[in-house]
Amino acid sequence: MGLSDRCTGAIPRIDTLCRTIVAECVKRGFQGVLADFETNPYSDRLSFLSRLSARLSARGMALYCPLSLPAEGAALLVGTGLSGGSLRALLEETACRYGAERLALDLERVMMDFPLPCPSGCGTPLTREELLALREKHPSSVYFSRELMAKYFTYSAGSGTHFVLFDDADTLAAKLAQ
């Protein structure tokens, strides 16, 4: 089962919600829950996820949480879609902090166009078609970043230089091998 966190405010009746989620998982034969929480604006989320994890675990089910909400007993999702740093270093640091047995890879297929310089580290997401169109319009060498475990190329346009980071079958396999 997948849970999102697009609601506003605190979660009312956390225990009731946890019981309802577990009952639905049992009813439908689900193996666990993925907490797809992209932000953490409310202080009750970690408590909610820890309680949910305990209830799921008691029924032999798993809870997968983002690293930003490391709920007790949950498997923690480590995103592989980096735009800076090193995937290996992130995995090693996270394994040391939480234990390798608690980690699960969130294998993200990245396709992003970054203007240079890019102090925010946030690029523009690309569709596969947009990526292919950029490659055709700006033919240049494609390189592999051992740190990011992704491929990239650069191009110049009227607005300046761009760095395009992307994954393919080879880079996704390399990320899994980490």
Regions found by a protein language model. Give the residues of each.
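Catalytic-core region of carbohydrate-active enzymes that cleave or remodel glycosidic bonds
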Residues: 82-102
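Chitinase-like catalytic core of GlcNAc-active glycosidases
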Residues: 1-83
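Substrate-binding cleft/loops of secretory-pathway carbohydrate-active enzymes
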Residues: 68-87, 112-126
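Glycan-binding loop/region signatures in secreted carbohydrate-active enzymes
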Residues: 106-174
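Glycine-rich, aromatic-flanked loop segments that form ligand/cofactor-binding clefts
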Residues: 1, 102, 111
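Short amphipathic alpha-helical segments and helix-helix/interface helices
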Residues: 49-54, 88-95, 176
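Residues at the N-termini of beta-strands
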Residues: 30-34, 102, 178
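Extracellular/periplasmic catalytic domains that process cell-envelope and extracellular macromolecules
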Residues: 70-71, 97-99, 156-157
